[in-house]
C-alpha cells in the first residue's frame, strides 16, 4: 500500500457547505461518551472541539459529577447524566443523533469498558473510538472487529500495538504496515504521530499528514482531534474523509499557535484555533 501526502486543497474540498438555510439541526448532532472521576475534562475538550468545528448540537453522556463539572465550562452542550445504564441511554438518544465519539477520559473500570464494547456492536450510526475506548476494543472478539464500515479509530503507537498484539517498537519501525493492518481489521484508522497516517479498509493507498508539530503533543490534544473528526462524521462525511479533514484542521490549528512558542500550549487553545483554521482553509 503506497503512502501519499494529503494536500491542503484536498482538505478544503472536503469542507461541508454552508447553505443560507443552515440551522443547528442540519449541522450535525454528535454524542460524546466519556469522562471519569480522574479525567473529567477529556470529554469537555472533545465537545468543545466539535462545537468549534461547526457541529450544530453536541450531547455529552457521562456521570452526573462529570456533567456538572463540564456544564460550568461549556453551557452550549446538552448533558445526559448517567442514569445507571450508559448503553441504554446512548441507544435511546440515537434516533436524534448522527454520530458518536466514545472513549475520551472514560477510564478502565470494567463497566466503562463494557459500554464501549456494547456500543461497538449496537450503536447504529458512525462511531469514533479513542482513548480508553481503544483499550476496551482490544478485548473485542475477532469477528466483531470487521462488523463496522463507518468507524474511525485514532490510536497512538502504544494503543495500536495493543490492538495488533505486537510491540510499540514494531509499530514505530513500520507505521504504514501497522496502519494498514489496523484498517483492514477495524475500518478506518488514524495512526497518530509524526507523520500522522490515515488508512482505510480496501484502500489502494494510505495518506500522510505532516502539518502537526510539537505544539500538538500536549495533554488533551487527542481529545480535541476526536471531537473535530466526530463533528464531521455527524455532518455526514465518510469515515475516511472525516478523519482526513479533522486531522488536517487539527494540524492547522496547532500551526496557528506556533508563533507564540510551542511550550505551554493548552488543548483548549488548540480547540479554539479550529474555527479560524477552518475559515482560513475556506479562503
Tell me the role of every PLM-derived stretch:
Residues 1-126, 135-152, 157-283:
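Small-residue (G/A/S/T)-rich helix-start motifs and N-terminal tracts that mark the onset
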